[in-house]
A protein has these predicted regions:
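Core catalytic alpha/beta fold that binds nucleotide/phospho-ligands
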Residues: 1-196
Length: 196
C-alpha cells in the first residue's frame, strides 16, 4: 500500500506512516536497499521504514542518503544529523523527522499482553490510575518508548513520568529533568505516540 498518512506536528517536523501490504520482493524492489536481516517481517519493516523516511525527507526538503547510528544506537540522517525516530509494528512502519531537536516516536498494537509487563514500566501512581485497562496501559507503554528514544541512553522506564493527559490525546511527561509534550493517536488498533 505504501504511505497512508503524512503530517507535520510542527513546522520543522514530519511523520510518515507506511502500511505494509507489499511482498518482501516488492519492498526490496522499491527500496533498492541491501540488508542482511534474516527475519522476513523485520526485513519488510526495514524497507518500509526507509521508504517512509524518504517520503518525510522529501516533505522537509532534505536529501535522503541513508541513516547512521550514534554510539548509543540512536539513528540520524547521514547527510546532516537531522534527528529521526523510527518505529514499526507489522504491518506499520512509522518515522518522525525533526530539523531542530531530538524527537521520539513509537507504535504499539493494543494487546492484553501489555498487562503482563506493566509492573516493569509503570510507577505506582500510573499503575493505580491505569488499573486493568489494556488501552491505557498500551498508551503509557508507547509514550515511554517514544520518550526513551529521545534520550538515546538507557533509562529506567519507571523513571519516565507521565502526568495525566492535558487533553484527550496530549500528555505532559518528564524524563531526566526534561519536560516533553507527547501526542497520542490511534490507528487500526495501534497506538502511536510522538513528541510535539
Amino acid at each position: 500500500m505504501g504511505i497512508i498518512k503524512t503530517f507535520s506536528p510542527s513546522s520543522n517536523s514530519v511523520i510518515s506512516i507506511w502500511k505494509i501490504e507489499e511482498s518482501l520482493d516488492e519492498l526490496r524492489d522499491i527500496s533498492k536497499q541491501i540488508t542482511d536481516i534474516k527475519n522476513e517481517i523485520k526485513e519488510m519493516e526495514y524497507h518500509a521504514s526507509r521508504e517512509a523516511l524518504k517520503n518525510g525527507c522529501k516533505k522537509l526538503g532534505i536529501d535522503f542518503i541513508g541513516i547512521e547510528k550514534d554510539s548509543n544506537g540512536k539513528p540520524y540522517l547521514k547527510n546532516n544529523r537531522t534527528e529521526i525516530s523510527i518505529s514499526h509494528k507489522f504491518p506499520y512502519a512509522v518515522v518522525m523527522i525533526h530539523k531542530e531537536r531530538a524527537c521520539g516516536l513509537d507504535i504499539e498494537r493494543i494487546d492484553k499482553k501489555v498487562l503482563k509487563i506493566k509492573d516493569k514500566f509503570l510507577n505506582d501512581d500510573e499503575a493505580d490510575y491505569i488499573g486493568e485497562s489494556v488501552k491505557n496501559a498500551t498508551i503509557y507503554w508507547t509514550i515511554k518508548e517514544a520518550l526513551y528514544k529521545i534520550e538515546g541512553e538507557p533509562v529506567a522506564f519507571k523513571k519516565i513520568i507521565i502526568k495525566r493527559s492535558t487533553s484527550k490525546n496530549q500528555f505532559e511527561c518528564r524524563i531526566n529533568r526534561k519536560n516533553y509534550t507527547i501526542e497520542v493517536d490511534e490507528l487500526d488498533k495501534h497506538i502511536i505516540a510522538y513528541t510535539n
